[in-house]
Amino acid sequence: MEKCTKSSSTMQVEPSFLQAENLILRLQMQHPTTENTAKRGQVMPALATTVMPVPYSLEHLTQFHGDPANCSEFLTQVTTYLTALQISNPANDAQIKLFFDYLSQQLESCGIISGPDKSTLLKQYENLILEFQQSFGKPTKQEINPLMNAKFDKGDNSSQQDPATFHLLAQNLICNETNQSGQFEKALADPNQDEESVTDMMDNLPDLITQCIQLDKKHSDRPELLQSETQLPLLASLIQHQALFSPTDPPPKKGPIQLREGQLPLTPAKRARQQETQLCLYCSQSGHFTRDCLAKRSRAPATTNNTAHQ
């Protein structure tokens, strides 16, 4: 009776260890080749610290639930175990599926992961490692690149591009924040900058008005210039015709039209305008008197404001 009770107690104490042995036996039965035997020999490569085999770690998973150091050691062993298999497509491999089935059952029993959905086992394992790193603040050095790059859809390389894209976006965000903060600090340090810019605009207003007057004068004089340009060839041909028919006749002393070299004929409208208007003494432009100069009017309030401000 004592032997029977002892045997029954041992059966109750080590159920997960027997499950781990059954897992290894199933893996050996499914892959009885020499290549797999060589892989089984190097399932757990030697680490710098003393490492327990993976089934033994899986058996004691309930003890690692509250101890960060033991949990870190366990995750390192699991990652090393999966990396040592050197499988090109872990999502469709039988060994990986069996291992994650067992891992999912153990994690679900400990309350770490809920739901043994086989289509998301790889994603659940990645989330477990990320949550562990964030909770303790010290990321473990793990070789998880084959698992992180593995996708259920073949030919999908977006997982390799996402980290680089996220890194570039983070750098651009930091640069934009730095530039904006620098501009904001400059604006706070120099609050009179806006007032100076407004004052500069008010000081330049007379010059702008003078330029507008010059442009308006050019546009107003353009039809007269065009009219004189059209009359010049006719006058030149008329003079040449008179010289051919009467070369010996002396020129008249007084004529209605007298042209010099390089001088355009003066139309009656232009002559009347020159007689009536004088140059402005303020902006040196014609077409208005000094008392009506817009530049003088715009500069006068600015001068009075500056004297009052001083």
Curated annotation (Swiss-Prot):
GO MF term list: nucleic acid binding; zinc ion binding
Keywords on record: Metal-binding, Zinc, Zinc-finger
UniProt xrefs under InterPro entries: RTL1-rel, Znf_CCHC, Znf_CCHC_sf
Keyword Coiled coil: no
Protein origin, superkingdom: Eukaryota
Gene Ontology biological process: cognition; norepinephrine metabolic process
Positions of CCHC-type zinc fingers: 278-295
Cystine residue pairs: none
Keyword tRNA processing included in the entry's annotation: no
PANTHER family assigned: LDOC1 RELATED, RETROTRANSPOSON GAG-LIKE PROTEIN 4
Function: Involved in cognitive function in the brain, possibly via the noradrenergic system.
Miscellaneous notes: RTL4 is one of at least 11 genes called Mar or Mart related to long terminal repeat retrotransposons. They do not correspond to functional retrotransposons, but rather to neofunctionalized retrotransposons genes.
Name of this chain's protein: Retrotransposon Gag-like protein 4
Lineage: Eukaryota, Metazoa, Chordata, Craniata, Vertebrata
Gene this protein is translated from: RTL4
